[in-house]
């Protein structure tokens, strides 16, 4: 009522552990969904293992929100499978919390494994607008992805990101290295 809408498109659990420990809440969401107040329910997860545990316990959700970007493709296979079963796939972390725009030389040794990759992207794309366009177009090119969530700091960034959708990056092939989770999950990064 306070939102001034008749229904909400989707509600996602943003803490997989809470979702696993709250079968009553999951059941209540199902009841609310049946009334039509909420159209879709699902989960925002950090690892494929979390998603597998949730599906094992509660069955297929309507929506999953996952981190996905040029470097982080851990969810690609399971997303293809879920999409084929009718699950809506939303992604976040297209720019990996801004890591792609940071100067690799200023990064701590924690990121040693990806510094050459980040340097190569910076050299090939020349500026942050092209990097953003390449990364956004990469994610949007995946047929299993329905929605992409990105963060912007101002209207100029939003316009730049939208304009980058008109650029052709099909000839820009950049291989991403296989990296460990400690580089893909920002909560595992050093605090500085």
Task: Tell where the protein language model's regions lie, with residue ranges.
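Active-site groove signature of glycoside hydrolases
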Residues: 1-20
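Beta/alpha (TIM)-barrel catalytic core signal, keyed to glycine-rich beta->alpha loops juxtaposed to Asp/Glu
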Residues: 16-191
């Amino acid at each position: 009522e306070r939102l001034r809408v008749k229904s909400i498109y989707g509600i996602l659990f943003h803490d997989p552990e809470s979702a696993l420990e709250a079968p009553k809440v999951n059941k209540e969401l199902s009841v609310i969904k049946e009334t039509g107040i909420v159209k879709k329910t699902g989960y925002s997860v950090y690892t494929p293992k979390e998603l597998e545990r949730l599906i094992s316990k509660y069955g297929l959700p309507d929506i999953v929100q996952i981190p996905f970007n040029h470097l982080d493709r851990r969810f690609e296979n399971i997303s293809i499978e879920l999409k084929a079963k009718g699950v809506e796939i939303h992604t976040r972390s297209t720019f990996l919390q801004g890591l792609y725009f940071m100067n690799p030389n200023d990064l701590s040794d924690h990121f040693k494994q990806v510094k050459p990759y980040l340097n190569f992207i910076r050299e090939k794309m020349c500026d942050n607008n092209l990097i953003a366009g390449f990364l956004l177009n990469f994610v949007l090119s995946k047929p299993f992805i329905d929605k992409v969530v990105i963060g912007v700091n101002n209207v100029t960034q939003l316009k730049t990101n939208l304009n980058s959708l008109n650029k052709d990056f099909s000839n820009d092939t950049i291989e991403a290295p296989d990296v460990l989770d400690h580089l893909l999950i920002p909560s595992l990064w050093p605090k500085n």
